[in-house]
Amino acid sequence: MADIKNLNPVEIWRNFDKLTQVPRPSGHLEKIQAYLLDWAKEAGVEAFQDPAGNIVMRKPATPGMENRKGVIMQAHMDMVPQKAPDSKHNFETDPIETIIDGDWVRANHTTLGSDDGLGVATIMAVMESKDLQHGPIEGLITADEETGMYGANDLPAGELNGDILLNFDTEVWGEFVIGSAGGIDITATLDYKEVETDKEDAAVKVTLKGLKGGHSGIEINEGRANANKCMVRFVREAISELDARLASWQGGNMRNAIPFQAEVVLTLPKENIEALNDLVADWKDEICDEFEGIETTENIEFFTENVETPKMQVPAEIQDNLVDAIYACHDGVLRMAPSMPEIVETSSNLAIVEIVDGKAAIKILARSSHEYYKMYLATMIESCFNMAGMKVEFSGSYMGWNPNPKSDILEHVLKVYKEQNGTDGKVQAVHAGLECSIILSKYPNLDVVSFGPTLLSPHTANERCQISCVAPFWNLVKQLLTEIPAK
């Protein structure tokens, strides 16, 4: 494990190093919540946990600066628990093993947690600082952002007092985000009665892995391969041409990550196994050809393993309906923003497919900065799975964050950034969910901007943070807090 705590600036890296030692996957936040409260008590910082599981910290103004506008610094405490297929890491018990790789910090075949651990570490650095001049400050460290923004959604109104929100969940240094996409989770489920497998049939497990995956908002416009969408094309042909039957399917594991791996168990007549192996080889070639220049094709694996024949399998009619629905379900970009053609407006990610033991569950995350188009896409997907006889539920819907290019805090941030770095910052809206939109719905008078150091491949085992960006990011935060204007 690399010693990252002495990297510059030590104020942030020291705290981030501590965070890597505390397990904090989404949905399992008891340890990090307790750690943050204990840390605040030891640092002499006022802190409490609200009913939503968020940690709120408060620091009074430096004497003489009590009349300045109040600033809320915001980041989320949870991290995406993704790992390489051969990793034995347990996200609920094991610390993250960090590695310094040139100008980057990464983990050992797991997500790093810099999304959004570096934001949390920045809040901690400000709160414990003894020499930083500032007005009234609050730190809002939210729970379960990655699985549905539940902490932000359940944030009590009236809990915060600030006038300005600095969100630290943007992943390209020099970009200042003033708008984001809304989102909605779509879950299609079906209970079915399994049927017996033909005793003369063999069984084969087919695995596709080695795809890049990635963030289903930020990287959806790159055209990366979706393991579930690739797999369904193969499965449909195996069923129609080789008399194969579906016994089970497992693809993807995170609603907001492009699935990089999928596996199915098929049963089929023994005399067709060789033809199935040939079909897998053909589809591997096809996938590599289609995604040449997008995927790292030498990492793609598509292979078969002979397995014990399961006693039960999916009924033929149910199987065909499920396969057709997965095949037809929209995945990827639906529309670019008409006013900003370089930015994705509406997209969806066919994130998770689980078909096993008489139960099917398919999970999709749709995003759009346009509320009508978000619901149009969600209803399109609902209709697709309704035709397969599935029950479809919507959850976790949140609206987008409408940009305000005349924001006072944006103007101030851009001014300080140019003073410090000699170049102009880039104002952006992003095709991803940021908690800013939800917090704004509860605190509509906040002036909001989001920024942060550069991260690459968040939500994947290749996640990494650029070391050289963290110091200028910290310098910007410090000067901003010092120069916040009076109310």
Regions found by a protein language model. Name each.
Residues 3-103:
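Acidic/His- and Gly-rich active-site-bordering loop/insert found
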Residues 9-12, 338-341, 345-358, 421-479:
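Zn-dependent metallopeptidase/amidohydrolase metal-coordination segment
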Residues 23, 103-106, 146-147, 153-367:
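Midchain, well-structured core segments that form catalytic/ion-binding scaffolds
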Residues 40-46, 237-245, 292-296, 343, ...:
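Short secondary-structure junctions
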Residues 65-147, 152-163, 189, 203, ...:
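Active-site metal-coordination/substrate-binding segment of hydrolases
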Residues 158, 223-241, 268-273, 320-327, ...:
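His/Asp/Glu-rich mid-to-C-terminal helical/loop segments that flank catalytic regions of hydrolases
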Residues 219, 226-228, 233-249, 403-446:
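Active-site-adjacent substrate-binding region
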Residues 343-432:
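Substrate-recognition/cap regions that form aromatic- and gly/pro-loop-enriched pockets
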